[in-house]
Each structure stands twice: as C-alpha cells, then as structure tokens.
Regions:
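Metal-dependent polysaccharide deacetylase catalytic core of the NodB/CE4 family, i.e.
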Residues: 1-70, 134, 139-147
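C-terminal active-site subregion of NodB/CE4 polysaccharide deacetylases
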Residues: 75-170
Length: 170
C-alpha cells in the first residue's frame, strides 16, 4: 500500500537547546549546543543510509512533535536531504504546529493528522475532516508501537496490521 520511511530524531530527543525547559511535562534532555544537535542529525542520516541503503529518506518527524526554532533553522540550513517536516496539525505544549505549506526556506510543512494502529472514532473524524478540508490523508506509525502496550502492542501484530488495512480500505 506504499508508504515512506522518515527520520524520527536521534535517540528520540527533540532538536532543542538548553533555552527550552520541559519541566515535568516531557522526559527529554536538551542539546548542549547546535554542534551537538548537528552531529546527532548527521549520525541519524548515516544510520538511515547504512540500514536502508536503497531507500531515499527526506522527511523529518520531530520526536513528540517537538522542534525548536533553532533546530528547525539548522535542518533547513545544514541538511538539504531533509525536504519535509511532518509534525503536528493540532496544538499542544511544546508542539511544532504546522499548516500545509511550503516554507520560505523551501521545506515542505506537512503535518501528520493521525497515528498508530488503534483507529478509533476520533481518529476517523480527524482523518475525514482533513480529507474534506485539504484533500490530504497523513498517518504515522512509530516503529515501537509494536512494543508499547498503550499504543497497541497488547492487541498483537496481526490485529494491529488488520486495523491499518481496515483503515486504508475505509
């Protein structure tokens, strides 16, 4: 049914410097400086190239939808292979919220609308609303959804796979 592999952060750490304080809201560290963030993204890209040599990846999905202004600027300036950022359409604390557009720096802003393999009525409503508004369907699945009981692992792979197939047919 198609699909695309993208980058989802180095060690699931958002691209944020020490000027961001997550407090008790998110369990993340910040990067010491921009050079450390840049090194992490380079390593992430090399890992992707080594792991999937025949796949061209161009989408960056911020961990927990968090992407600081400094991190966003660094991606645009230093990583031309990243041509799309897929974060969040809906607001949330620390979220990098997007509209569907091409930014002034040329990066495509393409928010994700739904995610996971537990497709409930809210997800269907959100997906249908987006289809009506922009004629777009965007869905994201975390690789570790298969291991996280809160995100469907308790259902088992066959049920999760069936849910995704049913969603695509829907």
């Amino acid at each position: 049914q198609g699909g695309e592999l993208g980058y989802h952060g180095y060690n699931h750490q958002p691209l944020s410097l020490s000027n961001v304080d997550y407090g008790d809201v998110l369990p993340y560290d910040t990067w010491k400086n921009e050079a450390a963030m840049k090194k992490a993204v380079k390593e992430l890209i090399h890992f992707g190239e080594d792991t999937f040599p025949s796949v061209s990846m161009s989408v960056y999905v911020p961990p927990s939808n968090v992407l600081s202004a400094e991190g966003r600027e660094m991606l645009a300036k230093d990583f031309p292979e990243i041509r799309t950022i897929a974060s969040n359409y809906f607001t949330g604390e620390f979220a990098y919220v997007q509209e569907f557009e091409v930014a002034k720096d040329g990066i495509v802003e393409q928010p994700r609308i739904i995610s996971g393999a537990i497709i409930d009525d809210y997800m269907k409503m959100a997906a249908l609303s987006e289809l009506n508004m922009h004629f777009v369907n965007s869905h994201f699945i975390h690789p570790d959804d298969l291991l996280d009981e809160d995100r469907g692992a308790a259902l088992g792979w066959e049920k999760m796979k069936g849910n995704l197939a049913d969603y695509m047919d829907w």
